């Protein structure tokens, strides 16, 4: 048996770009992109839509329809953070991961009196939704009218709790595409996938949904470590390792420090991981999975520059400039009379060739 390949940081970055589907976007549906990644972090919805569009040949074509048809939904499956998830996996994800978020927010729920108000909040929300999908603000208003609010943060935690117990989810896009309307899960999402949440389907009792997620995560993000996968889903490392025992379609590699990483074997094919296109320039939106999908970003981002992608450590990640598989700067846009203009903030001197490549990437950004 041959030893696992040893990859440089550059090779890891290039392989990750290929795994993410950013190098050669395929002709797939929007929900296929979300499914391949496992989930897409989406507290910034417009950025998440760009993340999906960049990973498919059709760009933004049909993207709205995938939400309006109920094929992609948004909820809080893990880490108390909004994500896009395939609708068919919604119940299973929440069955496995939801209790961890409930436990982590228990103290705040007690202070706000969430549990004693939850049944009334559910009843009033579902009554309002009989008239069709509603903006979150409308549900906040009916809760206010019912005397369920009054404390800052109570509306958010009631909404979170009703998403975590699979009563509600965020479904169709609003007219401006910057938010979603709330819908009842029972009406919006087919009752499928629940069997995947039942423990005991794989060796060691790992729930099938966890085994399936670990495989998707590593194929869609790898090379990545067990620690990366564990942190991203807030699952114990032991659960990730158990899922790996039966995972097909992933192989082990090592970085130069000898740390074990896992990835899809096809991202390692050819003369260089990811191929020549992976060495090009990419403009990624804020909170993109290429950045947020890892606990350890040091393979693609110099630690000295880490603070520059999230200034002040406030949790608000900036759009990133990627070149040669490395995060080499951030970017933004300004409005001019003639249209939008790209503004680059490289961490170090950027060659004229890469600047021109960034301009071309800017011109190709999906229109939403």
Question: Which sequence ranges carry the predicted segments?
Answer:
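Long, low-complexity intrinsically disordered regions
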Residues: 1-291, 296-299, 303-368
């Amino acid at each position: 048996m041959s030893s696992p390949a040893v990859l440089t940081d550059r090779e890891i970055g290039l392989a990750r770009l290929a795994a993410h589907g950013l190098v050669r976007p395929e002709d797939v549906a929007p929900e296929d992109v979300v499914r391949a990644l496992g989930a897409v972090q989406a507290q910034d919805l417009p950025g998440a839509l760009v993340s999906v569009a960049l990973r498919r040949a059709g760009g933004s074509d049909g993207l709205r329809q995938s939400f309006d048809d109920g094929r992609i939904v948004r909820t809080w499956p893990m880490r108390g953070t909004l994500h896009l998830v395939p609708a068919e996996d919604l119940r299973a994800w929440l069955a496995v991961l939801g209790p961890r978020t409930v436990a982590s927010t228990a103290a705040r729920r007690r202070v706000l009196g969430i549990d004693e108000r939850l049944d009334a909040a559910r009843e009033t929300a579902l009554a309002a939704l009989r008239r069709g999908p509603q903006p979150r603000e409308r549900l906040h208003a009916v809760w206010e009218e019912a005397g369920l609010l009054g404390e800052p943060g109570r509306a958010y935690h009631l909404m979170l709790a009703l998403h975590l117990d699979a009563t509600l989810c965020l479904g169709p896009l609003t007219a401006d595409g910057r938010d979603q309307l709330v819908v009842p899960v029972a009406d919006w999402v087919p009752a499928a996938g629940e069997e995947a949440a039942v423990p005991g389907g794989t060796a060691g009792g790992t729930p099938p949904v966890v085994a399936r997620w670990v495989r998707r995560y590593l194929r869609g993000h790898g090379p990545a470590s067990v620690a990366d996968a564990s942190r991203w889903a807030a699952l114990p490392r032991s659960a990730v390792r158990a899922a790996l025992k039966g995972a097909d379609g992933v192989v082990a590699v090592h970085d130069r420090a000898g740390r074990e990483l896992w990835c899809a074997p096809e991202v390692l094919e050819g003369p260089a991981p990811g191929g020549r296109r992976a060495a090009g320039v990419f403009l990624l939106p804020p909170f993109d999975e290429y950045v947020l999908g890892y606990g350890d970003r040091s393979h693609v981002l110099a630690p000295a520059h880490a603070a520059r992608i999230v200034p002040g450590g406030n949790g608000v990640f900036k759009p990133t400039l990627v070149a040669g598989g490395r995060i080499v700067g951030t970017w933004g846009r300004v409005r001019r009379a003639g249209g939008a203009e790209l503004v680059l903030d490289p961490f170090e001197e950027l060659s004229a060739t890469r600047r021109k490549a960034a301009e071309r990437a800017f011109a190709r950004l999906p229109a939403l």
